[in-house]
Regions:
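Class I (Rossmann-like) S-adenosyl-L-methionine-dependent methyltransferase catalytic domain
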Residues: 1-49, 57-107, 146-228
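Conserved beta-strand/loop positions that form the S-adenosyl-L-methionine
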Residues: 53
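Alpha/beta-hydrolase fold active-site loops
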Residues: 111
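A conserved beta-strand element that flanks and buttresses the S-adenosyl-L-methionine
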Residues: 115
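Short catalytic micro-motifs in class I SAM-dependent methyltransferases
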Residues: 118-119
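Helix-capping/helix-break motifs at membrane-protein junctions
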Residues: 124-125
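A short glycine-rich, Lys/Arg-flanked "PGG" loop and its adjoining helix->strand segment in the class I
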Residues: 129-141
Length: 228
């Protein structure tokens, strides 16, 4: 069911938006219910500097802080309006920050882990590849990249996934897509991760009405140069 994993930390994260504009509050509450962010959060390291790419209104970044006080989190998004809402949810500026940035063109700062949640499908496949490569530049060898995404499948749940995104984009809650989305197949997604320099495993999200998965990637060691 939607929101199968719930947590007190997620409730606290949502509560941070109590003074946000009504539309933003509505979206945040809907996202908290539908996206099962608590399931994704458990795969993120409990401490260190975490960069959340395409953070939107910042709900997942807030959850990361609420769930583990030893995390320092930076959320980056191109939408200035969403970043303004996200900054309104910040109480602990030393540990949680939001910045306007282009995750396709700009390399994120060096960090201990990168997260990307429900973002890549809005980008053409070549831009998805660029985002993954940018994430790789921010990580040391073995550094984790945690990505929640939706897969293209011959599955009734994929029709539900696609229809919901048409609604959210049409209502203006999500930017990008322009009524076209870029959901890769499992094989295509794995190939993109590998091409960006990651080794990756896939975690199925249980009891979901959508084709959601979590890609658990780690930056692969550099291959030694062949002997002359």
């Amino acid at each position: 069911m939607p929101g199968a994993s719930t947590s007190a930390a997620l409730n606290r994260a949502v509560h941070r938006y109590r003074a946000a504009p009504f539309g933003a509050r509505l979206f945040v509450h809907g996202r908290a219910f539908l996206s099962d962010l608590a399931f994704v959060e458990r795969f993120v390291p409990r401490k260190g500097f975490i960069v959340d790419l395409g953070c939107g209104h910042g709900l997942f970044a807030c959850l990361l802080r609420e769930a583990a006080e030893s995390r320092r989190v930076l959320g980056i998004d191109l939408d200035e309006r969403k970043i303004e809402v996200a900054r309104g949810a910040v109480r602990d500026t030393q540990w949680l920050r939001f910045e306007v940035g282009d995750i396709i063109k700009d390399q994120p700062p060096h960090c201990d882990a990168v997260t990307i949640v429900d973002v890549l499908y809005l980008l053409p496949f070549e831009d998805q590849q660029r985002v993954l490569k940018n994430a790789a530049t921010a990580l040391g060898e073995g550094g984790p990249l945690i990505v929640k995404a939706q897969e293209r499948r011959t599955d009734p749940r994929f029709a539900i996934t696609y229809a919901q995104e048409l609604v959210t984009v049409g209502l203006g809650f999500t930017r990008g897509g322009h009524e076209r989305f870029y959901f890769p197949s499992r094989d295509d997604a794995l190939a993109m991760f590998e091409h960006a320099g990651f080794v990756v495993e896939v975690e199925e999200m249980p009891r979901r009405p959508y084709t959601d998965v979590v890609y658990l990637a780690r930056k692969a060691p550099l291959k030694p140069s062949p002997a002359a």
